[in-house]
Regions:
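Accessory beta-strand-rich segments of carbohydrate-active enzymes
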Residues: 151-154, 218-328, 353-354, 508-509
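Extended substrate-binding grooves/exosites of carbohydrate-active enzymes
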Residues: 89-132, 136, 189, 300, ...
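Surface beta-strand/loop "capping" patches
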Residues: 323-355
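Extended carbohydrate-recognition surfaces in non-catalytic/accessory domains of CAZymes
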Residues: 85-246, 303-304, 309-312, 689
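Glycine/proline-rich low-complexity spacer/linker segments in large multi-domain proteins
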Residues: 93-115, 133-137, 263-264, 283-320, ...
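Lectin-like carbohydrate-binding module/patch detector with strong preference for beta-trefoil
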Residues: 1-73, 78-83
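Structural beta-strand segments of beta-rich domains
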Residues: 24, 241-243, 342-348
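Extended acidic/polar, glycine-enriched regions
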Residues: 282-285, 349-437
Length: 689
């Protein structure tokens, strides 16, 4: 009670009344009154009012804030986008040699989407709405593209840097730094030396440490570091929104600061890294700083047969959402065998990290390829914590199924409305209805047997290194279609999200492979201290890509041996999604692959396994080795496959030669030799010079 009745001016004293869930009503008792009044947010959400009814009152939560750091805007700086400034502690360099520390303050993985303020704005961005691999329109989407020119400083080692303790400060003078394109592998700008290896690591094999370069690959320095800086401008319209920075891929470890404050840490070079920077930015100009390590402990899981290059090699962008928002969506369907009728469910994750008491209306609409609405449904979220809500659309009929031959896509539109029915967020996802089943040792899609006629692929661009632009992706895929390729194995790591959108639309069957290969040190796959890292990479792949109809198989990695850690990653896949799981290293005595698989078998060996391998559908994950030469024996292999009762297909190694321009010449604009030929170098030739 009010000071046990001792307070003589009770109308100036407030009482906290427990409202549950760590929230409280604020009550006061006016003089000469025997009843309490409560604070309530007014119906427009713009101010406070009083009510004598507790049921009409607003429950308030409390957060810890620093008075010395907080709040309001100053001229040229704008106002903070969150109630309190961010405080994520500090980065510890020992993390790059700790296989159990895979990230810090990084967001959970989720399906790819770009938020808009309304369905109207979503559809007004017509090109991205129809072709999700296209660049979103920043005037319509809650999105800012950060690709382009950044300031850059390269240092051949981790122990020294350009003001390494203060380079991230907002007022640090980087005028003497170079400019660099983002995305780009920095070796292609002649910073350090590109390295091509098949089995061996480009650093001394001493896990989890990845510091000393290997002289046989021309790398004599210690672990290199790239320092990146750029200004980001937060529009005034984002003042009351939640702001995220998103990296599609960075080789191999990245530390992020905003306005001199540490935001977070990430490794796993080919999966998304997203950070909530709401409490770190203000409206107007802000300073983004990123330190990238060429190698880290995670590089032991990135020992693929490829060019080993470094830096921010995929897209970087900002997005803004409401403070409470749909952070993930998982689309599933229950269909008849032909995938022409059934139901669709969309599980929505409502993120309420600030435990605000609120109500949101969530709507899911299904539209055909002509943008005609087929069905719609809603769910209501009401609460103070993160929760999942599922919208199910039943009784769907006359569906046009998706396949590689007829890649028909529907559009799933998700929208969110506030307590007053005002729309505040919307996004869309392309979705195809299809059934994947197994009968005997054969795989069927929509009740039809499929021959998976595939290729392995790598991210290699002659000028940009591992940074593959949209035009190159589309050129590769359209050429594959012309060559009657219907399957892509993303050897040996997930691709950029936009490439899956292309494969959905063009019609490919995808074996989506986790970024896990420890070819030179296969003991890691049975060392339990590496489970966290292996499982994180696998989980992030599945959570990001499971809405894509093109993804038919998950693959746990490549050439890691048959270690028991794969039992964990197999179960992770199965717990998150129902697709079949592949792993070539799983022998006959293991239970962590739904397919029998091997690489480079002879035709006679394939003939001997024509009814299946290890009692499972047989997939030849690599064969007809084609690096630098023509493909041979295809007819002989396919005579056996097409007349088998248990072989489902395979993937040629590999789609395109992994050649790059010589960076030392490229930096001077020289792409051709003195005789006029393109001056491309292969990995083994380059390493020997």
């Amino acid at each position: 009670d009010y000071n046990s009745g001792l307070e003589s001016n009770a109308n100036q004293e407030w009482k906290l009344v427990d409202a549950g869930n760590s929230t409280y009503y604020l009550a006061c008792r006016p003089q000469h009154s025997s009843s309490d009044y409560y604070l309530a947010v007014n119906t427009s959400g713009t101010g406070l009012t009083k009510t004598s009814s507790k049921t009409s009152a607003t429950a308030f939560g409390f957060i810890k804030a620093s008075a010395s750091e907080g709040g309001g805007g100053t001229e040229g700086g704008g106002g903070s986008t969150e109630e309190t400034p961010g405080d994520h502690g500090s980065f510890d360099v020992s993390w790059i040699s700790n296989q159990s520390k895979v990230s810090d303050h990084k967001e959970d993985a989720h399906a790819t989407f770009i938020p808009y303020a309304s369905v109207e704005q979503l559809k007004a961005d017509a090109l991205h709405y129809e072709q999700p691999w296209q660049q979103p329109d920043e005037t319509k989407a809650e999105y800012i593209n950060l690709n382009g020119t950044w300031k850059f400083k390269y240092v051949a080692g981790t122990s020294y840097g350009p003001g390494s303790s203060e380079f991230q400060a907002k007022d640090y003078n980087d005028s003497g730094w170079d400019d660099i394109r983002v995305p780009l592998s920095w070796e292609m700008a002649n910073y350090g030396k590109p390295v091509y290896t098949n089995v061996g690591y480009p650093f001394s094999n001493n896990p989890p440490n990845a510091n000393s370069g290997m002289s046989q690959y021309g790398v004599t320095d210690h672990n290199a570091t790239g320092f990146y800086r750029r200004t980001i401008n937060i529009p005034a319209t984002w003042k009351d929104k939640r702001v995220f920075i998103h990296f599609d891929g960075v080789y191999s470890a990245a530390v992020v600061w905003v306005n001199g404050k540490y935001v977070g840490y990430s490794q796993s070079s080919n999966t998304d890294a997203e950070f909530d920077i709401t409490g770190f930015v203000t409206t107007g100009d802000n300073q983004l700083s990123v330190r990238v390590y060429r190698w880290c402990d995670g590089s032991y899981l990135e020992g693929q047969d490829m060019w080993h290059l470094s830096g921010i090699h995929r897209d970087v962008y900002l997005v803004a959402t409401p403070k409470v928002f749909v952070s993930d969506h998982y689309i599933t369907s229950s269909l008849n065998n032909e995938a022409t009728s059934g139901s669709m469910s969309v599980k929505l994750t409502v993120d309420n990290r600030n435990t605000v008491s609120t109500t949101k209306t969530l709507q899911v609409s299904l539209l055909d390829a002509d943008d005609n609405q087929i069905a719609t449904g809603t769910q209501t979220y009401s609460g103070t914590s993160t929760a999942e809500k599922t919208v199910t659309l039943s009784g769907l009929s006359n569906l046009r199924p998706w396949s590689a031959e007829d890649p028909y896509l529907y559009t799933v539109v998700v929208s969110q409305k506030d307590e007053n029915g005002a729309e505040e967020m919307a996004f869309s996802t392309k979705y195809g209805f299809r059934n994947i089943t197994k009968s005997g040792n054969l795989i069927y899609i929509n009740k039809k047997r499929v021959y998976f006629k595939g290729v392995n692929t790598q991210d290699t661009h002659p000028e940009y290194g591992r940074a593959i632009d949209m035009e190159t992706m589309m050129k590769d895929l359209t050429m594959m279609k012309k060559a009657n390729v219907n399957t892509v194995r993303t050897s040996h790591y997930p691709r950029q999200p936009k490439m899956y959108a292309m494969m959905d639309a063009l019609g490919f069957y995808v074996m989506d492979e986790a970024d896990v290969e420890c070819h030179y040190n296969q003991n890691l796959s049975s060392n339990s201290s590496w489970i966290t890292a292996m499982d994180d990479r696998t989980k992030r792949m599945v959570l990001r890509d499971r809405n894509h109809p093109s993804v038919i198989f998950w693959s746990l990695g490549n050439e890691c041996g048959g270690g028991s850690n794969f039992s964990t990653t197999y179960n992770t896949c199965k717990n998150l999604d129902s697709r079949f799981v592949h792993y070539e290293g799983a022998g006959s005595g293991t239970n962590y692959s739904d397919l029998g698989s091997n690489m480079y078998p002879t035709v006679s060996s394939v003939q001997g396994n024509r009814s299946g391998l290890n009692g499972k559908p047989y997939f030849i994950c690599e064969y007809a080795h084609a690096m630098g030469q023509a493909v041979g024996n295809l007819k002989e292999y396919w005579d056996v496959i097409e007349n088998s009762t248990g072989i489902i297909g395979g993937c040629i190694w590999d789609w395109v030669d992994q050649s790059v321009y010589d960076p030392a010449r490229l930096v001077n604009g020289q792409k051709k030799s003195d005789k006029g030929f393109n001056y491309w170098v292969s990995g083994y030739d380059y390493n020997s010079t």
